[in-house]
C-alpha cells in the first residue's frame, strides 16, 4: 500500500507543509511506501526533503493507496470522499478545521477513519468534535541541528509578522516610543525566507517577539527557544501547551500593553545575563525535550502501526 500525502503548493512557506514531508520521510525510514502529492509535482526549495514527489494523474479508484488529507479544504475532502480508498486527516490546526468540515456532521462523512493531530490541543478538540474517529498525537519537532544559537548574539529582536502584521507594526512603534533607551536594538523581520535563513536570523537574535495567532500548536516560539532567544509575546492559544512562566514572557491574546512589558523584560533579562538568563535557557531546554525529532518519529510509528493494522 502506498501512503499518499496531499500537500498544498510548496511555493507557500508554511510550517505545516514541512511536517507533511517530515512524516512521509519518517514512514519511508520505517519501511512504508509514502509519497507527497503536490499539484505541480514540485519539490520545495525553502527546506530540504528526500520524500518522493508525485503530481497529477496518481489518483484512481482502483489504486492501492491510503490518502492523508488536510483538515481545512472542503473541496478536496468532498472530491476524495468519492474514492473508495481509506482516508486519514492530518490536522495541524483545529481552528482552520472548521473551514474544512463545511456542512458535514464530522469528518467521517468524507470517509475519514483516523485523525493525526500535531498537538495535544488538537487531539483534545478532535476527541470532542469527532468522537467516532480514532485520533493520535504526533508531536511537532524542532531540529536542534538547524535551530541553535549563533556563536555571537546581537542586540536584535526577531519577529515573524505573517499572522499579525498590523500588531507587529504597532508593537514596534510603541516599544521605541515607551522605551527610547532601547532604540539601538535592531528589529529583524523573518518573512518569506527558507528554513536555513530563518534559523540563521533567530540564531543571531537575543529576543523573539511571538506573534502567534489561532495556532493549533505554534512551533516558531519553540524554534526561537532552541535558537537561544528569550521569547516574549502571544501563545496563539495552541502555544499554551508548552508556555510556562519559566520559558517565556507570555501574555494574553491581544493584550498590547502587556506585550510591551513582556518585550522589555526579555531585553533586560538578556542585558542582566548571569544566573537568571541561564535559568531561563535551562527551562527552554526542558520544554524542548518533549519536541525532538525522535519524539516525532516515535509518534509517527505509534500512530501508523495502529492505522495500518485497522482495515
Predicted stretch roles:
Residues 271-308:
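A charged, aromatic-enriched C-terminal amphipathic alpha-helix characteristic of glycosyltransferases
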Residues 230-233:
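Short hydrophobic beta-strand element within catalytic cores of glycosyltransferases
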Residues 16-19, 124-195:
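Conserved catalytic-core segment of nucleotide-activated headgroup transferases in glycan assembly
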